[in-house]
């Protein structure tokens, strides 16, 4: 099927494009991206039989890519399935997501990787790129078979949800990953220092009678992994950056030429620890929401390029796992359907330009993962069309996700994906 997207503002930072243009899609790929598609050799009669999208007043951008999503399947289908997670992703404008390996069983082998890929194919929505486990069973004791995982379709490895505590094992993991050209996505947390903590350490935690988690829990491991990255030359990606100290360490490492990249999530540049006031478990996550100083450091890191990508860390949980005492409530929030609207606030507030935001949500994730970049002719037609002026209210009961654990319910946001096109197929509108 041919699709003609006409009259939209095409923003493709990878190819230096920011102009009103038409895009023609044929056989799942970008055939033409020009100001005057209708004047090329394609006949008007054939174009008239195509599906046509009037994108006037809309933004047409390379498909958004979320490098950090928990789809929960296999094992926790009551929280999310690959089908529902992909539906949520498509609704949020994401043409591709990376599925973290902390499933049950853990994705540490070919069979689980192929299961995830087959389920994603059956869903027929956003692309799913499985992330394999650094260690067998996320145990931190024995490395997974990286060659087998890569051959099955894994692009990166991670023990996300848990840190790799053993420095010797992490060094071996980096050396092994480098040999197979796999990205390591590191969950940076010192569990001994974090023991018992449920929110950011500080005056608010003291007043609430809760055990705090100091910033050093994250930054200590960030600095360790940067040192191992410099030692091994492996590609390292720091997950869910939340502290000023981590931003500073990553910035300095990049100046030294270290092959490290980093991500953060909208909750870390939008909220602070104040969101847990009243023991709001929908604002409980790991890493926890931090101080205003940390939030500002995250914004500065996004602005100066220290932080490469915006992800969701989409972590679905049932209401029973959230509607309980703060100490025992599950960590994590969902974000696939709110991320774009929250991230566009950075443009509205002058923190990022629109082009830079698209880099953080599409171009940079593609580059880090080794995927096709931008809307170049011949690339897969993975495209997100955004209405930047659409004002909408977050209503969790309308989410495509099976879960409702968001601290943003009731928020008014501006900007929303109106079409998500994956491989030339319209997945949502």
Sequence positions of predicted segments:
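Metal-associated gating/positioning segment near the N- to mid-region
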Residues: 55-120
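His/Asp/Glu-enriched, well-ordered alpha-helical/loop segment
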Residues: 207-235, 282, 303-304, 308-310, ...
């Amino acid at each position: 099927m041919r699709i003609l997207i006409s009259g939209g503002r095409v923003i493709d930072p990878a190819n230096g494009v920011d102009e009103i243009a038409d895009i023609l899609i044929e056989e799942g790929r970008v055939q033409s991206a020009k100001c005057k598609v209708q004047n090329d050799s394609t006949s008007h009669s054939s174009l008239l039989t195509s599906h046509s999208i009037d994108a006037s007043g809309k933004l047409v951008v390379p498909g958004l890519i979320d490098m950090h999503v928990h789809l929960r399947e296999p094992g926790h289908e009551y929280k999310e399935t690959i089908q529902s997670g992909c539906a949520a992703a498509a609704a949020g404008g994401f043409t591709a997501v990376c599925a973290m390996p902390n499933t049950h069983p853990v994705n540490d082998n070919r069979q689980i990787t192929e299961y995830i890929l087959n389920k994603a194919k059956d869903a027929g929505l956003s692309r799913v790129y499985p992330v394999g486990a650094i260690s067998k069973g996320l145990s931190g004791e024995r490395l997974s078979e990286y060659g087998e995982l890569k051959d099955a379709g894994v692009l990166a490895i991670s023990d996300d949800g848990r840190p790799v505590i053993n420095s010797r094992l992490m060094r071996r993991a980096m050396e092994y990953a480098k040999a197979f050209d796999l990205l390591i996505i590191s969950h940076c947390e010192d569990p001994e220092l974090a023991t018992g903590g449920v929110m950011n350490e500080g005056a608010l935690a003291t007043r609430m009678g809760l055990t705090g988690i100091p910033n050093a829990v994250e930054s200590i491991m960030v600095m360790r992994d940067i040192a191992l990255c410099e030692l091994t030359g492996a590609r390292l990606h720091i997950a869910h950056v939340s502290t000023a100290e981590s931003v500073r360490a990553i910035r300095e490492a990049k100046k030294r030429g270290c092959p490290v990249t980093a991500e953060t999530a909208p909750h870390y540049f939008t909220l602070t620890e104040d969101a847990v006031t009243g023991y709001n478990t929908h604002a409980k996550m790991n890493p926890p929401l931090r101080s205003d100083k940390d939030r500002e450091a995250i914004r500065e890191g996004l602005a100066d390029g220290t932080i490469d990508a915006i992800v969701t860390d989409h972590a679905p949980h049932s209401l029973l796992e959230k509607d309980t005492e703060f100490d025992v409530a599950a960590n994590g929030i969902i974000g696939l359907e709110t991320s774009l609207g929250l991230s566009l606030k950075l443009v509205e507030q002058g923190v990022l330009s629109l082009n830079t935001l698209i880099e953080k949500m599409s171009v940079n994730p593609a580059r880090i993962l080794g995927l096709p970049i931008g809307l170049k002719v011949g690339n897969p037609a993975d495209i997100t069309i955004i209405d930047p002026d659409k004002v909408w209210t977050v209503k969790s009961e309308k989410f495509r996700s099976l879960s409702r654990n968001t601290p943003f319910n009731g928020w008014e946001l501006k900007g929303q994906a109106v079409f998500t096109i994956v491989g030339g197929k319209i997945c949502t509108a």
